[in-house]
Amino acid sequence: MNVKIKKLHNWDMTPTEAILLQRELAQKVSACGTLSSISLVAGADVWHSRTSGMGRAAVVVLSYPDMNLVEVSRSEGDCHIPYIPGLLSFREMPLLLSAFEGLESMPDLILMDGQGLAHPRRLGIASHLGLFLNKPVIGCAKSRLVGEYTPLADEAGSYSDLYHNSQLVGRVLRTRRGVNPLFISVGHKICLEEACSRVADCCRGYRLPEPLRHAHLAAAELI
């Protein structure tokens, strides 16, 4: 195991305490940084059973830029904390961190299925993960949590900036013509421009970029 994970805090806290912690941790998120070279990129996703409290996290590492499969790590267990809007990371992070601990090699960049700065308190799961790993993370969500944006064109590559309370928090990016766009935001240690560029580089004709598409399949045990 070559993945180093910081010990930021424990998980035994009330929703009120979690919100206060989010506000504190948000001050530590870096929304700048340039990746000089990338050889490995990972996608991370969490699957939840509809009939039980079980969850399964998957981290899939691909080579960059050719997107060949390198490694898959999974972790499953009970998600004891119920889903509360805005507090997703407190439900999913323990499983995610366990999956990252199972990796043999640490990726240079991580795409997380979820929000980064596009969050009411600027600490979505992608930003929270970035602080634990101290690595560049991009939030790549399939739906909007906060913010407003102008309609974008139907062509792949079209985008619109996402604003919340007059602050730029992300970008709405259409990765494939005729399909719903993705909501891209800074997770940690990367700027928004590069985050969107890297997501586009990882797309191979599907709505989801390859690291997240593989992570979604791995979490559902389809690969």
Curated annotation (Swiss-Prot):
EC nos: 3.1.21.7
Ligand binding (Mg(2+)): D45, D113
Cofactor(s) of this protein: Mg(2+)
Residue ranges that the Swiss-Prot or TrEMBL entry lists as coiled coil: none
Positions of transmembrane segments: none
Cellular component annotations (GO), alphabetically ordered: cytoplasm
Protein name per its UniProtKB record: Endonuclease V
Species of provenance: Dehalococcoides mccartyi (strain ATCC BAA-2100 / JCM 16839 / KCTC 5957 / BAV1)
Record gene name: nfi
